[in-house]
Curated annotation (Swiss-Prot):
Full protein name: Ribosomal RNA small subunit methyltransferase G
Its biological purpose: Specifically methylates the N7 position of guanine in position 527 of 16S rRNA.
GO function term, MF aspect, one: rRNA (guanine-N7-)-methyltransferase activity
Protein's UniProt keywords contain Protease: no
The reaction(s) this protein catalyses: guanosine(527) in 16S rRNA + S-adenosyl-L-methionine = N(7)-methylguanosine(527) in 16S rRNA + S-adenosyl-L-homocysteine
Keyword Cytoplasm: yes
Chain residues that bind S-adenosyl-L-methionine: G78, F83, G129, E130, R146
Keywords noted in UniProt: Cytoplasm, Methyltransferase, rRNA processing, S-adenosyl-L-methionine, Transferase
Domain of life: Bacteria
Organism field: Geobacter metallireducens (strain ATCC 53774 / DSM 7210 / GS-15)
EC assignment: 2.1.1.170
Bilayer-crossing regions: none
CDD domains: AdoMet_MTases
GO cellular component, one term: cytosol
Length: 220
C-alpha cells in the first residue's frame, strides 16, 4: 500500500477505537499486495485499488471490534477473501481464529496469507458451514459473518457451533436494522434474541454499517 492508503487505514481504525502498531500496518500492506496479485488470476474481490482495500476491506473488517472483544475463540463463516477474519487475526494474533469457506481457491489464498503473515493461531478450512458441527460443536465464543447470507440462515448454521453465552454477529450495511427486525420471528423459533444493533458510518466513506449481535435467549 502507498502511504496515503496506510494513513487511511491507521486513521480509519483509530476512529473505530483500534490503534494499529507499525508492525500491524506492515502486515496489512503485505496482505493488500498479495490480494491484488492473486486477484489477477483468481476472482477474490471486486475491490482492487489500495484506497478501497484499506477502507472497504481492512477498516470495515476492523469495525467488528465494536462488538467482539479480545480473547475467546472466533469463527468466520463464509469468509471469502479473508474478511473480516484475517484483519481480526492480525489485530489479535494470540486468539484462536477459524475461517470457513466453501470455495477452495479462496481458502488456498487464506492459507497462503496465514503462513506469510505468521498467524500461528489462524486456521482456514475448506468446507460448508453445516459440515462443521461434528468437529466444532459448542466450540466458539464468537461466530461472525460479513455479507454471507440472510440473518436466519446464518444463525441456523452458527447455533450448533456456539458455546453457552456465546454471541453471533452479522456484519451488515445500512439496512441492517431493518433486516434484523424482519428476522425476529424466525429467530424466535430458533430460541435466539437480538441483543444489540450497532449502527455507524464507515470512516471516510460515510457508508452505513450495522453490527447485529445475537445470542441464545435466557443467556444474556
Amino acid at each position: 500500500m502507498d502511504q496515503e492508503a496506510k494513513d487511511l487505514l491507521v486513521r480509519g481504525a483509530a476512529q473505530l477505537g483500534v490503534e494499529l502498531t507499525s508492525a500491524q500496518v506492515g502486515k496489512f500492506a503485505l496482505f493488500a499486495a498479495e490480494l491484488r496479485k492473486w486477484n489477477r488470476k483468481i476472482n477474490l474481490t471486486a475491490i482492487t485499488t489500495e484506497r478501497e482495500i484499506a477502507l472497504k476491506h481492512f477498516v470495515d473488517s476492523l469495525s467488528l471490534c465494536r462488538a467482539v472483544g479480545k480473547g475467546g475463540k472466533l469463527l468466520d463463516l463464509g469468509s471469502g477473501g479473508g474478511f473480516p477474519v484475517i484483519p481480526f487475526a492480525i489485530l489479535h494474533p494470540k486468539s484462536e481464529v477459524v475461517s470457513v469457506d466453501a470455495v477452495e481457491k479462496k481458502i488456498i489464498f487464506q492459507r497462503h496469507m496465514g503462513r506469510l503473515l505468521g498467524l500461528s493461531c489462524f486456521q482456514s478450512i475448506h468446507a460448508r458451514g453445516e459440515e462443521l458441527a461434528g468437529r466444532f460443536a459448542g466450540h466458539f465464543d464468537w461466530i461472525v459473518s460479513r455479507a454471507f447470507s440472510d440473518i436466519p440462515t446464518f444463525v441456523r448454521m452458527a447455533l450448533p457451533l456456539l458455546r453457552p453465552n456465546g454471541a453471533i454477529v452479522a456484519m451488515k450495511g445500512q439496512g441492517g436494522r431493518e433486516e434484523a427486525e424482519t428476522s425476529r420471528p424466525a429467530l424466535e423459533v430458533l430460541g435466539v434474541e437480538i441483543r444489540q444493533v450497532l449502527e455507524f458510518p464507515l470512516p471516510f466513506s460515510g457508508d452505513g454499517r450495522s453490527l447485529i449481535v445475537m445470542g441464545r435467549k435466557n443467556e444474556s
